């Protein structure tokens, strides 16, 4: 059994991209926001 810390198992950004690290942490949430937007839109039009 191999034990890895989180950074080794997921991977590190290359050094040139380290300023974008906080942005990369947020990017996977964006599709969920579109899903939430679809429900809000349907609620606004009363689920026609």
UniProtKB/Swiss-Prot annotation:
Gene: psbK
InterPro entries assigned to the protein according to its UniProt record, in alphabetical order: PSII_PsbK (IPR003687), PSII_PsbK_sf (IPR037270)
Protein name, entry field: Photosystem II reaction center protein K
Organism of provenance: Lepocinclis buetschlii
Propeptide: 1-11
Gene Ontology process terms (BP): photosynthesis
Oligomer status and interactors: PSII is composed of 1 copy each of membrane proteins PsbA, PsbB, PsbC, PsbD, PsbE, PsbF, PsbH, PsbI, PsbJ, PsbK, PsbL, PsbM, PsbT, PsbX, PsbY, PsbZ, Psb30/Ycf12, at least 3 peripheral proteins of the oxygen-evolving complex and a large number of cofactors. It forms dimeric complexes.
Family: Belongs to the PsbK family.
Compartment list: Plastid, Chloroplast thylakoid membrane
General function of this protein: One of the components of the core complex of photosystem II (PSII). PSII is a light-driven water:plastoquinone oxidoreductase that uses light energy to abstract electrons from H(2)O, generating O(2) and a proton gradient subsequently used for ATP formation. It consists of a core antenna complex that captures photons, and an electron transfer chain that converts photonic excitation into a charge separation.
Transmembrane regions: 23-43
Keyword annotations from UniProtKB, A to Z: Chloroplast, Membrane, Photosynthesis, Photosystem II, Plastid, Reaction center, Thylakoid, Transmembrane, Transmembrane helix
Gene Ontology, cellular component aspect: chloroplast thylakoid membrane; photosystem II reaction center
Bilayer topology term: Single-pass membrane protein
Domain of life from the UniProt record: Eukaryota
The UniProt record lists the keyword Transmembrane: yes
Span of the signal peptide: none
UniProt keyword Cell membrane present: no
């Amino acid at each position: 059994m191999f034990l890895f810390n989180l950074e080794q198992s997921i991977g590190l950004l290359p050094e040139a991209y380290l300023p974008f690290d906080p942005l990369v942490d947020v990017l996977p949430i964006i599709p969920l926001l579109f899903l939430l937007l679809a429900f809000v839109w349907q609620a606004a039009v009363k689920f026609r």
